[in-house]
UniProtKB/Swiss-Prot annotation:
PANTHER family on file: 50S RIBOSOMAL PROTEIN L32, CHLOROPLASTIC, LARGE RIBOSOMAL SUBUNIT PROTEIN BL32C
Classification via InterPro entries: Ribosomal_bL32, Ribosomal_bL32_plant/cyanobact, Ribosomal_zn-bd
Pfam families given in the database record: Ribosomal_L32p (PF01783)
Organism listed in the record: Prochlorococcus marinus (strain SARG / CCMP1375 / SS120)
Official protein name in the record: Large ribosomal subunit protein bL32
Ranges of Basic residues composition bias in the record: 1-20
Protein family according to the UniProt entry: Belongs to the bacterial ribosomal protein bL32 family.
Amino acid sequence: MAVPKKKTSKGKRNQRHAVWKAKAGDAAQKALSLGKSILSGRAQGFVYPIQEEDSEE
């Protein structure tokens, strides 16, 4: 027998939304930090291939 679900409170909804937004903000901050480290040349935690032009051909 189908029973309607209880309505989720505004507080619970806002809490879930805040957690979701915080995770997205953390991911964006990490990506920005990684990009800055790549551009500054101080990246040490991963392999980043740098394309070098060969003029000896």
